[in-house]
């Protein structure tokens, strides 16, 4: 009593307290970073190793396996997978979400050190690791083009200067450069000339190394002067290499130009970048973890004019794609929904209370509560993102509830003739406990969600804490500022209403009277209502089991990732032409704004940016279907397109479809036998589309078989023979050119015109210790064979990942069920194990955890209400409102053809907190009436239901109108917001229709049950006493 009186009697202090909350929130709002979704830093670490020329099988057995055995001992590793290809091994470690990434990185380095002694001695460098954030996509893509500069020169400028400068911009984590390689001197050997001159490849390599040798040469001192010693020991360009003497024949020098074509070129000639189908260097920029995307992009934009001034004027340096327009549009849509929600809930208050002064009170209380929440968001390290702003939008209907309950009760006393100060004090005292119970029990709903440290907890922690903070501030405001304003703004006599408002009031009165008559009938036929309630519970279970399910709504970000996979035997030139054609066709589509990408060897990928959503009539899914239709009949190459999502979960990188299904086996033969059988069976399923696999066995190889006995007689070692092949075909970097700005390689290989087919091996020879030229064909034979383009491991087992997309009109749950049935029907042997990976695996895990989280929320609310009411029974009465809300939510999702996702699950949890408010208002007043008015239970609940009908309608409509903008808004990011709004609106409508009747009936049922139990205990105690 004194607590409430303190704030009513000290209006200045109360006003300044509210002003302080508002000012702190406003300042925090300015400082909050902006991002599309909450910070989701998955602890991934990637380990890479390099051994030029080694086959995928060699890399897997000699490099990947030793590293995997050492890395597999690290604590907290959730999944370990590796990909070994020609000369490369990449191992990806996914850690548990609770694992500290920096501690994990130290353990990874220690594991690499422990495995180093087991690795091949021929590796040019130690394995390296880097921390990867797979959940974040590029924030900006830049292109570099020019008609006057070579690709190598453009790449040099981009990698040496531009990438370095852009990496220094605050908020930028990484700038990767693609579409080319650094300039290099390429030495293309003529095997016929080498044979005729008697020059081995090893002679050439040694001669070049000796001719280009930068070493310190010291200085010369005298008594008066010092001289630096400088020599012309470095060769700077192709011309300077031509005259190198590589051999002497009959006393005459054989120069490099006699046996090779030397030219200024690039390190890797089998990579190309394009923008809209034209040559370009592509810079891909990613942000630091937690950095403000919008601010980072703005800083990059501010830096670009400076960078353009520092590069040649005839180089075009442009922004191709960036994420800020979509993010800005999405957040603007949420802010608009928030503003509409605030306006709607204030309109509800005005319609019910029929007073401008009364409406002003929640019109002030709501913004104070919402703005004050920004302070907690800033202190917790949150950002302004879709989920946190959605929480504030939904909170609009919640924070006004507390003010409504207090305001409505005070208004009722004013209408009864009490003075404003007396009405304020009496009104807030009567409903203070009710407001406390409503707010605390609503916050309790999110306790299980916040405490979970897995996917659900990480994803919705911002949402839960933001909403809980808004409710907490609202509770404080409703018990302090609201009664103070009521005492000083409202008058004892009711305001005269406008005619249309009286009309609304009459309609409300008629509804209330009709409700009273129907409630009396219901209270006399409670059995049927209880049976209906049981039926609703059963219907809930049936609907949940049968409703289509997915993990996360697919967003229309306006960005598409494209993969082009050519036949393994396709040449690089053929692949580049196909890539150019694909990009030109895609770029010509009316919904496409631009397309960038690069290709390497027999594959390529593209970043496709669509026009803003307001400028196109088709969704991203329909655009993808149309583009694939245009390019599906291209011979020799296949196109895969998938929408880029703001949230990327685990799974193997580079997958060409969204969802993944992994096959594992310790028997590689069994895996190779069953993988194509399973893949073909899955490709026939109507629920799946774009089925593909990382296991390819179509690559061609030349299998060389040495005659070791003959080699021993000829004095040739296997090492020498392998060195010959490596120098000839491995594009070996044999020397380095040191220039002030960068270092450039000297690359040696047999000229491309001599390496078109296996016949080029016949031109290879080795010079033995006797100086004899011995052709490779003399001691070796070879034959064509098929070989995998990559070898994959998961854990320590061989693996293959089948990727797929969900077909139109199906959901992820449909696809998973179909795959599981197919695996059962195929009778796959136990030697081949299977499991879902990435998003599909997370979906399976969340399916089992969702029910437990919802159950934990209900139990938590029960415990809180039990403590507040000092009762085991009354919390059950209040929780009886939940089944009807669940049915309404699930039916609404079915009606809108929206699958049940994590967003919808959060909507269900919100309903747990919302719909019980009506029951709390009823039960609290019924209990008070029973205690003070000497009324029976039936009379008390009837009086409470009728007396509190107006605040129940106001709170329900406020929550409903707070969620309604999320349903109706169809702009950017609507895919995230609509499931939440649909769930809440559907649940509220059904709950409002049913709980006005079921709650009084359940209240009576438990009251009668309590009396029977008490009566039996009384009889038993009397029997005991009499005996």
Swiss-Prot record:
The gene is mdtC. It is found in: Cell inner membrane. This is Multidrug resistance protein MdtC. GO terms for cellular component: plasma membrane. The chain crosses the membrane at residues 12-32, 333-353, 360-380, 387-407, 432-452, 463-483, 528-548, 851-871, 873-893, 895-915, 951-971, 982-1002. It is a multi-pass membrane protein. It comes from the Bacteria. Gene3D superfamilies: Multidrug efflux transporter AcrB pore domain, Multidrug efflux transporter AcrB pore domain like, Multidrug efflux transporter AcrB TolC docking domain, DN and DC subdomains, Multidrug efflux transporter AcrB transmembrane domain. Pfam families: ACR_tran (PF00873). GO terms for molecular function: xenobiotic transmembrane transporter activity. SUPFAM superfamilies: Multidrug efflux transporter AcrB pore domain, PN1, PN2, PC1 and PC2 subdomains, Multidrug efflux transporter AcrB TolC docking domain, DN and DC subdomains, Multidrug efflux transporter AcrB transmembrane domain.
């Amino acid at each position: 009593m004194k607590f409430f009186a303190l704030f009513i009697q000290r209006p200045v202090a109360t006003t300044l307290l509210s002003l302080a909350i508002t000012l702190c929130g406003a300042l925090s709002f300015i400082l909050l970073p902006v991002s599309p979704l909450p910070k989701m830093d998955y602890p991934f670490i990637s380990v890479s190793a390099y051994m030029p020329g080694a086959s995928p099988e060699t890399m897997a057995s000699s490099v990947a396996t030793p590293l995997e055995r050492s890395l597999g001992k690290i604590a907290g590793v959730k999944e370990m997978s590796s990909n070994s290809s020609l000369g490369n091994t990449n191992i990806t470690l996914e850690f548990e979400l609770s694992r500290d990434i920096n501690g994990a990185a130290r353990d990874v380095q220690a594991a690499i050190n422990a495995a180093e002694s087991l690795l091949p001695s021929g590796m040019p460098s130690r394995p390296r690791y880097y921390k990867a954030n797979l959940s974040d996509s590029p924030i900006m893509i830049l292109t570099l083009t020019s008609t006057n500069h070579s690709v190598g020169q453009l790449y040099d400028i981009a990698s040496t200067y531009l990438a370095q400068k852009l990496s220094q911009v605050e908020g930028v984590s990484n700038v990767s450069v693609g579409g080319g390689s650094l300039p290099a001197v390429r030495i293309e050997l003529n095997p016929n000339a080498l044979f005729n001159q008697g020059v081995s490849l090893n002679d050439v390599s040694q001669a070049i190394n000796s001719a280009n040798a930068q070493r310190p040469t010291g200085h010369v001192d005298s008594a008066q002067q010092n001289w630096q010693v400088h020599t012309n020991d470095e060769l700077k360009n192709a011309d300077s290499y031509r005259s190198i003497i590589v051999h002497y024949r009959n006393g005459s020098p054989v120069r490099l130009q006699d046996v090779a074509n030397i030219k200024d070129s690039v390190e890797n000639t089998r990579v190309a970048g394009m923008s809209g189908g034209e040559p370009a260097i592509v810079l891909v920029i990613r942000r630091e973890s937690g950095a403000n995307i919008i601010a980072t992009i703005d800083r990059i934009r501010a830096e670009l004019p400076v960078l353009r001034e520092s590069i040649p004027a005839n180089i075009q340096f442009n922004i191709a794609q960036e994420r800020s327009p979509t993010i800005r549009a999405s957040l603007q849509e949420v802010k608009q929904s928030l503003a509409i929600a605030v306006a709607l809930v204030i309109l509800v208050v005005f319609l019910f209370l029929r007073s401008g002064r009364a409406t002003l009170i929640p019109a002030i209380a709501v913004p104070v509560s919402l703005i004050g929440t920004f302070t907690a968001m800033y202190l917790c390290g949150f950002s302004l993102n879709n989920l946190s702003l959605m929480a504030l939008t939904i909170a609009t209907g919640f924070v006004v509830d507390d003010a409504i309950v207090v305001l409505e009760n005070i208004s009722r006393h004013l209408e009864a003739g009490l003075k404003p100060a007396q009405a304020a004090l009496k009104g807030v005292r009567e409903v203070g406990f009710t407001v406390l119970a409503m707010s605390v029990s609503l916050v309790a709903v999110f306790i299980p969600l916040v405490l979970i440290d897995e996917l659900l907890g990480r994803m919705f922690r911002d949402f839960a804490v933001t909403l809980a903070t808004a409710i907490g501030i609202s509770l404080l405001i409703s018990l302090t500022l609201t009664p103070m304003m009521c005492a000083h703004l409202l008058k004892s006599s009711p305001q005269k209403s406008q005619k249309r408002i009286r009309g609304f009031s009459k309609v409300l009165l008629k509804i209330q009277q009709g409700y009273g008559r129907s409630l009396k009938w219901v209270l006399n036929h409670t059995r049927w209502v209880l049976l209906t309630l049981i039926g609703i519970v059963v219907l809930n279970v049936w609907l949940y089991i049968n409703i289509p399910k997915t993990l996360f709504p697919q967003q229309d970000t306006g960005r598409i990732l494209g993969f082009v996979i050519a036949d393994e035997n396709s040449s690089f030139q053929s692949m580049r032409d196909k890539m150019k054609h694909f990009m030109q066709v895609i770029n010509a589509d009316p919904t496409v704004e631009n397309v960038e990408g690069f290709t390497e060897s027999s594959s390529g990928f593209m970043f496709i940016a669509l026009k803003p959503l307001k400028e196109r009539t088709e969704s991203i899914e329909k655009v993808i279907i149309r583009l694939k239709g245009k390019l599906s009949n291209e011979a020799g190459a296949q196109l895969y397109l998938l929408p880029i999502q703001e949230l990327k979960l685990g799974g193997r990188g580079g997958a060409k479809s969204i969802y993944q299904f992994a096959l594992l086996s310790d028997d590689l033969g069994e895996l190779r036998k069953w993988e194509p059988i399973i893949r073909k069976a899955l490709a026939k399923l109507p629920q799946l589309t774009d089925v593909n696999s990382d296991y390819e066995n179509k690559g061609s190889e030349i299998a060389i078989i040495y005659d070791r006995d003959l080699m021993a007689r000829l004095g040739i070692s296997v090492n020498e023979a392998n060195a010959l092949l490596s120098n000839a075909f491995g594009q070996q970097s044999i020397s380095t050119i040191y220039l002030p700005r960068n270092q450039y390689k000297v690359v040696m290989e047999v000229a491309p015109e001599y390496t078109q087919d296996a016949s080029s091996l016949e031109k290879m020879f080795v010079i033995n210790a006797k100086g004899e030229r011995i052709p490779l064909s003399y001691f070796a034979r070879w034959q064509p064979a098929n070989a995998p383009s990559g070898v994959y491991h998961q854990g320590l087992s061989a693996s293959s990942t089948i990727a797929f997309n969900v077909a139109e009109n199906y959901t992820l749950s449909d696809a998973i069920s179909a795959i599981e049935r197919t695996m059962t029907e195929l009778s796959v042997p136990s030697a081949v194990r299977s499991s879902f990976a990435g998003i599909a695996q997370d979906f399976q895990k969340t399916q089992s955890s969702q029910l437990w989280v919802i159950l934990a929320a209900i139990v938590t609310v029960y415990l809180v209400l039990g403590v507040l009411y000092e009762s085991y029974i009354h919390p059950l009465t209040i929780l009886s409102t939940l089944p009807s809300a669940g049915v309404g939510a699930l039916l609404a999702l079915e009606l809108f053809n929206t699958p049940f996702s994590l967003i919808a699950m959060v909507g269900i949890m919100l309903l747990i907190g919302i719909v019980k408010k009506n029951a709390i208002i009823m039960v609290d007043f019924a209990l008070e009436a029973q205690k003070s008015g000497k009324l029976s239970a039936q009379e008390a609940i009837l009086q409470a239901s009728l007396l509190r009908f107006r605040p129940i309608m106001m709170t329900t409509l406020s929550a409903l109108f707070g969620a309604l903008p999320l349903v109706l808004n169809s702009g950017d990011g609507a895919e995230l917001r609509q499931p939440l709004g649909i769930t809440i609106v559907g649940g509220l409508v059904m709950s409002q229709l049913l709980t006005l009747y079921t709650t009084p009936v359940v209240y009576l049922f438990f009251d009668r049950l309590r009396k029977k139990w008490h009566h039996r205990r009384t009889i038993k105690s009397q029997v005991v006493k009499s005996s």
